[in-house]
Swiss-Prot record:
Residues 1-6, 319-322, 369-378, 422-450 are cytoplasmic. Keywords: Cell inner membrane, Cell membrane, Membrane, Transmembrane, Transmembrane helix. Residues 28-297, 344-347, 400 are periplasmic. Pfam families: CreD. This is Inner membrane protein CreD. It is a multi-pass membrane protein.
Length: 450
């Protein structure tokens, strides 16, 4: 077997494929590095503007001082404790209009969104009946609105409670801190009537916009000009419409679904970043780095199909190709991915794919004209390479049926190879070539006499 030309041919082709894995891995490393550079740009934009935003509120914080007694050494001792009671709204309505703009640093872009939010909350005074005990003293209440990054708070219109304009102050007003704003309620017996709050604020950020549905019944409607939303969080929108011009989504929830009534009743717990929320993220669709990385996963398939076509050509014709010629064609296929990555950063992925495919086809067409001794075979292989590039493009753009399409390509390629080689005597290729035997001489030819 070691003397078989077919064995050494297959071994050399397998070795060429293994060698080509090295530049493929290097290109994938370059893709990771370029994607990291893009992530650094997004971080820089986030640091210079504001980060993801999580809106909690409006809710009313009521300082409570409670006197209670305990038994110590056969005597009654009076104790005092202070805590914050959160008065949650019966209904919370959030209506927002979001505008997304792109910020560019070098060749990289990131997104910053600006949302104009209108908040309407109704508070039922009957929820405060538990605070009417004689041993309880109430402090001055204030409305709390918490956000993820206070740098994103823009214009805030004067909020109104029961038609009365109030003053808004920075910070949440809570001892535990937190970023946001608070609105002191006016003096008076506010416990004798229901409260209706109306306010509007401009909130900017990057990445996620989340709103905690703190009302007994909560709804949110958001309209945006960004066509690539990613709906996250604990609640998917009840309704949503996504088009090339943007999206509109509507969420709704209640305490029966999120249990926020009990979680806020825990008092001084302000770990609100873990509370369930309506969420949507402004995300970049599958960018050039993700697409190029996916494309490189099919590189071995492209190289294997090309080598298989060359091998069948050798088998059916008298033309012989050296393993170095296989390797050079394979390198040109690998360079396609590096060229695709470099071009896609400037022209977009689709245009880069077309240009890289044409450049690769021209390179191989000119080279194969000399290798295959003619333009006819060269053009045939060049068109086949362009067809394979088209198949790879189809695989990238059919995520749901990529497995089916890829399997179909392999089945068709294998069936084609089986068909064109069905009459080949492989044993003839496997046998080592025998040296031509010398002519047999007769005794009469060796004689020096007659």
């Amino acid at each position: 077997m070691l003397k078989s030309p077919l064995f050494w041919k297959m071994t050399s082709l397998f070795g060429a494929v293994l060698l080509l894995l090295i530049p493929i891995m290097l290109i994938r490393q370059v893709i990771v590095e370029r994607a990291d550079y893009r992530s650094d740009v997004e971080d820089a934009i986030r640091q210079s503007t504001s980060g993801p935003q999580k809106l909690v509120g409006p809710l009313i914080a009521i300082p409570v001082t409670e006197l209670y007694t305990v038994q110590e050494e056969d005597k009654t001792v009076e104790r005092k404790r202070s805590f914050i009671h959160f008065w949650l709204p019966e209904s919370l309505m959030v209506d927002g209009n979001q505008n997304v703009e792109e910020r560019k640093i070098g060749i990289y872009t990131g997104q910053v969104w600006h949302s104009d939010l209108t908040l309407k909350a109704d508070f039922d005074v009957s929820r405060l009946s538990e605070l009417n005990a004689p041993n309880i003293t109430l402090g001055k209440p204030f409305i709390v609105i918490s956000v993820g990054d206070a740098r994103g708070i823009g214009v805030v219109k004067a909020p109104e409670v029961n038609g009365t304009a109030l003053t808004i102050e920075p910070g949440t007003g809570l001892e535990q801190g937190g970023q946001g704003v608070h609105i002191p309620l006016p003096e008076g017996d506010w416990r004798k009537q229901n409260l209706k709050l109306n306010m509007a604020l401009n909130l900017s950020g990057t990445g996620d916009l989340s709103v905690v549905p703190g009302g007994r019944n909560s709804e949110m409607t958001l309209t945006s000009n960004w066509p690539h939303p990613s709906f996250l969080g604990d609640f998917l929108p009840a309704k949503r419409e996504v088009s090339e011009s943007g999206f509109q989504a509507h969420w709704q929830s209640s305490w029966f679904a999120n249990n926020l009534g009990e979680r806020f009743a825990s008092g001084n717990d302000t770990g609100w970043e873990n509370f369930p929320a309506f969420s949507v993220a402004v995300t970049t669709p599958a960018d050039q780095y993700q697409l190029t990385d996916r494309a490189t996963k099919y590189a071995i398939l492209l190289i294997a199909l090309t080598f298989m076509a060359f091998f069948v050509f050798e088998t059916l014709t008298a033309q012989r190709l050296h393993p170095m010629q296989y390797l050079l064609v394979g390198l040109s296929l690998v360079m396609f991915y590096l060229l695709l990555l470099a071009l896609s950063e400037h022209t977009g992925f689709t245009v880069a794919w077309i240009i890289a495919s044409l450049i690769g086809a021209i390179m191989n067409g000119i080279y194969l004209q000399a290798v295959l001794k003619g333009w006819c075979n060269s053009m045939l292989f060049t068109l086949a390479l362009l067809l394979l590039d088209g198949v790879m493009w189809g695989l990238l753009n059919s995520a749901d049926s990529a497995l089916l399409l890829g399997t179909s390509v392999l089945v068709v390629a294998l069936a084609g190879m089986m068909f064109v080689t069905r009459n080949i005597d492989w044993y003839a290729f496997s046998l080592p070539k025998m040296k031509a035997s010398k002519e047999v001489t007769t005794d009469d030819e060796l004689r020096i006499w007659k």
